[in-house]
Amino acid sequence: MELVLKDASRALEVSETTFGRDFNEALVHQVVVAYAANARQGTRAQKTRAEITGTGKKPWRQKGTGRARAGGIKGPLWRGGGVTFAAKTQDHSQKVNKKMYRGALMSILSELVRQERLVVVEQFAVEAPKTKELKAKLKAMDLEDVLIVTAEVDENLFLAARNLYKVDVRDVAGLDPVSLIAFNKVLVTADAVKQIEEMLA
């Protein structure tokens, strides 16, 4: 199959497997959920009454003081006491094998092509790390909510996009399924397309 370049009068021959496969919603959902879960720290921790440092002695006698009866100072009703159902550190990570991950990426890329949300250009760069210059360039291409994918990290492009809302710059190695579906359009250079094919082959 062919992808037409927006800034050149030629088409790019690409693999049907990478850019023309059916959309597997269940697979994409599973991989996106796993990706988000793997980003979680899961390091929160609270103490139960058993883990609180302090005496187990009864604070005052049962009867005769006029105060409410109390058996200890570490209960959840007390200031500084334990938490009833204390949160514990946990591992939220989910295993996704390479074949599934690659399959999800190819499924997303194919759907972007079908929906005409994948914009392929010969090359894309800015001369200086200026947000104004990048904004004007994107406006000329009628792009606003866009993920820019280049073959290698372009520092000028990265710095220029850093202060733009709904614009992100990634190299092929930094591609992930969540970023691909988070933006309205995905702008990819011809070199990046070739790298993506090699990566997912």
Swiss-Prot record:
UniProt organism field: Shewanella amazonensis (strain ATCC BAA-1098 / SB2B)
Keywords for this entry? Ribonucleoprotein, Ribosomal protein, RNA-binding, rRNA-binding
Molecular function (Gene Ontology), one example: structural constituent of ribosome
Where are the stretches annotated Disordered? 46-71
Q: Which family does it belong to?
A: Belongs to the universal ribosomal protein uL4 family.
- Tell me the HAMAP family matching this sequence: Ribosomal_uL4_B (MF_01328_B)
Q: What does this protein do?
A: One of the primary rRNA binding proteins, this protein initially binds near the 5'-end of the 23S rRNA. It is important during the early stages of 50S assembly. It makes multiple contacts with different domains of the 23S rRNA in the assembled 50S subunit and ribosome. Forms part of the polypeptide exit tunnel.
Instruction: Name it.
Output: Large ribosomal subunit protein uL4
Name the Gene Ontology biological process terms.
Answer: translation
Give the source's domain of life in one word: Bacteria
Q: Its quaternary structure?
A: Part of the 50S ribosomal subunit.
Name a GO CC annotation attached to this entry: ribosome
NCBIfam families registered for this protein in UniProt: rplD_bact
Q: InterPro entries given for it?
A: Ribosomal_uL4, Ribosomal_uL4-like, Ribosomal_uL4_dom_sf
What is the gene name?
Answer: rplD
